[in-house]
């Protein structure tokens, strides 16, 4: 079975990594959908889709995950929830299930006839991308504890912290 795992991954954190591992214990292949692919260079979406793809791929490689079982595909947003599942389907290989804890995503895919696999919360209270981005914008190194080592390296290598600090400045 092939399953879809959608998210913005701004940034890809240890909770996301745990969901990927959990999913690959249950499905043959996993399609990681990098959502809001058109968004970047904002405090809410600091990384480009390509930067997120690179960070996710390096994190999975670093963890020894077989990349032959994983697709990482950027998908831009549309502003119509009722058409979103069909929109996503145009970007990804066929799939039978979706991995999510998001109530809206769950409803949309269930209504479209897909099986929903709901992973455990995996440190949901600790691994919150909004909090990670806030720490990054402040220059607080604690954010590094919340993301896979490879993701922290990519973020530093690409200058994402500097980008966020600049974006957080006031006129």
Swiss-Prot record:
Recorded metabolic or biological pathway in which this protein acts: Cofactor biosynthesis; NAD(+) biosynthesis; NAD(+) from nicotinamide D-ribonucleotide: step 1/1
**A biological-process GO annotation:** NAD biosynthetic process
Please state what class of enzyme this protein is.
transferase
* Cellular localisation: Cytoplasm
User: GO MF terms on file?
Assistant: ATP binding; nicotinamide-nucleotide adenylyltransferase activity
Q: Which reaction does it catalyse?
A: beta-nicotinamide D-ribonucleotide + ATP + H(+) = diphosphate + NAD(+)
Q: Which is one Pfam family of this protein?
A: CTP_transf_like
Q: Give the intrachain disulfide bonds.
A: none
Please state the Enzyme Commission number of this protein: 2.7.7.1
Can the keyword Transferase be found in this entry's annotation?
yes
Q: Which GO terms describe its cellular component?
A: cytoplasm
Q: Which SUPFAM superfamilies match?
A: Nucleotidylyl transferase
Determine the domain of life of the protein's source.
Answer: Archaea
Please provide the record's keywords in A-Z order. ATP-binding, Cytoplasm, NAD, Nucleotide-binding, Nucleotidyltransferase, Pyridine nucleotide biosynthesis, Transferase
**Keyword Cytoplasm appears in the UniProt entry:** yes
Please name the InterPro entries in this protein's record: Cyt_trans-like (IPR004821), NMN_Atrans_arc (IPR006418), Rossmann-like_a/b/a_fold (IPR014729)
Please state which protein family the record places this protein in.
Belongs to the archaeal NMN adenylyltransferase family.
Q: Which protein are we looking at? A: Nicotinamide-nucleotide adenylyltransferase
Q: Which organism is it from?
A: Ignicoccus hospitalis (strain KIN4/I / DSM 18386 / JCM 14125)
């Amino acid at each position: 079975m092939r399953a879809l795992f959608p998210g913005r991954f701004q940034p890809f954190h240890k909770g996301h990594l745990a969901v990927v591992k959990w999913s690959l214990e249950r499905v043959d292949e996993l399609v990681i959908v990098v959502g809001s692919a058109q968004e970047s260079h904002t405090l809410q979406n600091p990384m480009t889709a390509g930067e997120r793809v690179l960070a996710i791929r390096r994190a999975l490689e670093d963890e020894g995950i077989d990349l032959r079982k994983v697709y990482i595909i950027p998908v831009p947003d549309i502003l119509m929830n009722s058409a979103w599942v069909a929109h996503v389907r145009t970007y990804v290989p066929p799939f039978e299930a979706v991995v999510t804890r998001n109530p809206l995503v769950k409803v949309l895919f269930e209504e479209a006839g897909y099986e929903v696999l709901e992973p455990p919360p995996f440190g949901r209270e600790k691994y919150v991308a909004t909090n990670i981005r806030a720490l990054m914008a402040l220059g607080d190194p604690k954010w590094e504890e919340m993301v896979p080592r490879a993701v922290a390296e990519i973020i530093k290598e690409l200058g994402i912290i500097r980008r966020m600090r600049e974006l957080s400045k006031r006129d």
